[in-house]
Curated annotation (Swiss-Prot):
Database matches in HAMAP family: UbiC (MF_01632)
Protein's job: Removes the pyruvyl group from chorismate, with concomitant aromatization of the ring, to provide 4-hydroxybenzoate (4HB) for the ubiquinone pathway.
Name the UniProt record assigns to this protein: Probable chorismate pyruvate-lyase
Key words, A-Z: Cytoplasm, Lyase, Pyruvate, Ubiquinone biosynthesis
InterPro entries with a match to the protein in the record: Chorismate--pyruvate_lyase (IPR007440), Chorismate_lyase_/UTRA_dom_sf (IPR028978)
One CC-aspect GO term: cytosol
Originating gene: ubiC
Length: 186
């Protein structure tokens, strides 16, 4: 069986440096917000849900996955859409090394349609590393996803990613704001 994940880590350049002139102030607020994206989206919509696109185990591949876990033999990759009022607004991809999936963190592999953000932000041991941002050019894999979701777009999209630590065990969360998110409006 062929497994195809959206190559977020390998398809663009991620950077912790972003200037206000690079994007709008509204977009910057969304990209650099350290708080729970789940809570923010829930506050802005009447109906919030998580739609799991896929969850797969991969042997580490530098072509598909981030360099953060290159020493890991296996990584769990979870791809979801965050949906507000029946519109997908964020595509999220999480990389969880198998070494993280021990003890209390083993349940990360079984959260299904529950929000990972809710799990993370309720855990008192959680800490978040710096936020990195990336711009996805037109014709990228992310844009193909938008077409598949009937959200065609002719401008670059933005995403962010952070390493999170739960009981000092790492996982990487990447989030791309889709056109229906409304954050690209002036």
């Amino acid at each position: 069986m062929d497994i195809t994940i959206t190559p977020l880590a390998s398809s663009t350049l991620w950077s912790a440096d972003i200037t206000p002139t690079t994007c709008s102030e509204n977009l910057l607020d969304w990209l650099l917000d350290q708080n729970s994206l789940t809570r923010k989206l829930q506050a802005l919509s009447a109906d919030f849900k998580v739609k799991v696109r896929q969850q797969v185990t991969l042997s580490h591949s530098k072509d598909l996955l981030s360099p953060y876990f290159s020493e890991e033999n296996k990584v769990l990759v979870r791809e979801v859409l965050l949906v507000c009022d029946n519109k997908p607004v964020v595509f999220a991809q999480t990389e969880i090394p198998f070494s993280t999936l021990t003890d209390q963190q083993a349940k990360l592999a079984e959260i299904g349609t529950d929000s990972l953000g809710t799990f993370l932000f309720q855990d008192p041991s959680m800490r978040r590393d710096k936020i990195e941002v990336a711009q996805f050019p037109v014709y990228s894999a992310v844009h193909q996803l938008c077409i598949d979701l009937n959200q065609e777009v002719d401008f670059p999209l933005w995403g962010r990613r952070s390493l999170f630590y739960v009981n000092n065990k790492p996982l990487l969360v990447s989030e791309v704001f889709l056109p229906a998110s409304g954050i690209y409006l002036p």
